[in-house]
Amino acid sequence: MADRIGKPVSQRQLRVGEMIRQSLGMIFARNEAKVPNLETNTITVTEVKMSQDLKIAKAYVLPLGGKDSELVIKKLKECSFLIRKALSKKIIMKYLPKILFAKDDSFEYAEKIENLIKQTNK
């Protein structure tokens, strides 16, 4: 597995990314970040990718049912400081990474591939 530059992803990046993914999931499930006008208990964190220096975390999220995903991502980006503050209480690191949120398209991509396979099998 390699990141976009072509360098392999280290075990530390994977471990820290998974730790942040689990913590973000708990924060959203318990609504600990207190994001205004957003029900965070319906948000799923599918993956977190870390930068090489562990200072940037890109969290791929998907709201329940996939509806209003653009609005949810926008709200999360606006209130990322609240989420980061809640995350700082869960994770002890020298530098807590900046969190970037992105929509997870992997389920849509998998469904598209599955439909293509079904079409070729007919």
Swiss-Prot record:
Coiled coil, from the record: none
Keywords noted in UniProt: Cytoplasm, Ribosome biogenesis
GO CC terms: cytosol
GO BP annotation list: maturation of SSU-rRNA
InterPro entries tied to this protein: KH_dom-like_a/b, RbfA, RbfA_dom_sf
Superkingdom in the source lineage: Bacteria
Principal place of residence: cytoplasm
Compartments (UniProt record): Cytoplasm
GO molecular function: ribosomal small subunit binding
PANTHER family: RIBOSOME-BINDING FACTOR A, CHLOROPLASTIC-RELATED
Family designation: Belongs to the RbfA family.
Subunit field text: Monomer. Binds 30S ribosomal subunits, but not 50S ribosomal subunits or 70S ribosomes.
Known role: One of several proteins that assist in the late maturation steps of the functional core of the 30S ribosomal subunit. Associates with free 30S ribosomal subunits (but not with 30S subunits that are part of 70S ribosomes or polysomes). Required for efficient processing of 16S rRNA. May interact with the 5'-terminal helix region of 16S rRNA.
Name of this chain's protein: Ribosome-binding factor A
Species this chain originates from: Pelagibacter ubique (strain HTCC1062)
